[in-house]
């Protein structure tokens, strides 16, 4: 399957790489954003100090393709790592299924972008499969867990499972330092940290990709994301939140780059 990025898509990725590189250099997401855009960086209190930016692309502009390429850019320019753990959040279970099919298909452009960035060492799984995630897989591959935001919440049946103690995940918690132990949340009814998927994510500090981010900018969503101790959050949406009034529970996205409808039309 032949795939070539559009000019506007390449520009998005170039701007994102530049921002991530500058954030790493400064160790300051706020200042890097202001240098890049000359606009105020809107902090989310639960995620203060975190690179949390948005690429605004009209519907039909290839947001999933951009997200797939962005994983490699973040690993190279911000995380400075040859592999990473990714939590890829889609707005509906239908889109989760579509995304899973694309990312697991080695001939699909999205998967090929990932394989190129990580030399073919990529594992893609849904949330249920991630409940059995083994240390060896995390140490050899870039692991991408695809889910909805709703499924991560404690009130959801699947969400509860990711916070539960699990012997299957035990090897991921061997040999932790005191500092690492201090990051973990205790299991219900236990005096020790839970050997849970949620705590595994906290240890590994995932890169979080948010598809259609306007559905995920609520206090409850921020609270859910903060529990995973992310290293970076990248949003891709056609309709970002633009009003910033936290007292009224409006939290504006930090739009790093905006593709106009005219740019899209010119190439399609």
Explain the meaning of each model-derived region.
Residues 1-268:
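RecA-like P-loop NTPase motor core of helicase/translocase proteins
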